[in-house]
Amino acid sequence: MDIAGKTVAFLGDSITEGVGASCVENRYTDVFARLTGGVALNYGISGTRIARQKVVTEDLFDRDFNMRVEEMDASADVVVVFGGTNDFGHGDAPIGKFTDNTVYTFYGALHVLYRQLLERFPEKDIIVLTPLHRLSENVTINERGIPCEPLKKYVEAIREVAE
């Protein structure tokens, strides 16, 4: 895919936002734009999750991916979605099952998110990235003490719904 001159909208969490990068110019979105000749629009917010939480606060990190789709520039040529690690790490939404269609389970939120993206960006390429490996990826109790599935199950859900 030739990206030169195209606009790529990146929807994600702290990794997309650039937390940990040595400077703004070294966020992966900016490096991608430099290497491809594209224009990067960064919609990353640290701590955010794909699924909605049971109790939503005014904090930025409670603005799940589904809440933010309408804020994305609809003229983008390509959309990249990179999330799921915070759903595993500290979310309170259960993973659910493939047939779910609610933002309150991970599977359901994926279905809702991909449907919203397809409606907002018809005929555009949508690329879905799975979470990076973590040291604690096999735990079944997350950082907030809430039962969860191992990270591999979140990766499988992302792949399954994206297909």
Feature map (PLM): residue ranges:
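Short intrinsically disordered, low-complexity coil segments enriched in acidic
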Residues: 1-2, 9, 125, 163
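Conserved SGNH/GDSL esterase-like catalytic core that processes O-acyl groups on lipids
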Residues: 2, 7, 15-108
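Alpha-helical cap/lid subdomain in secreted, periplasmic
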Residues: 63-163
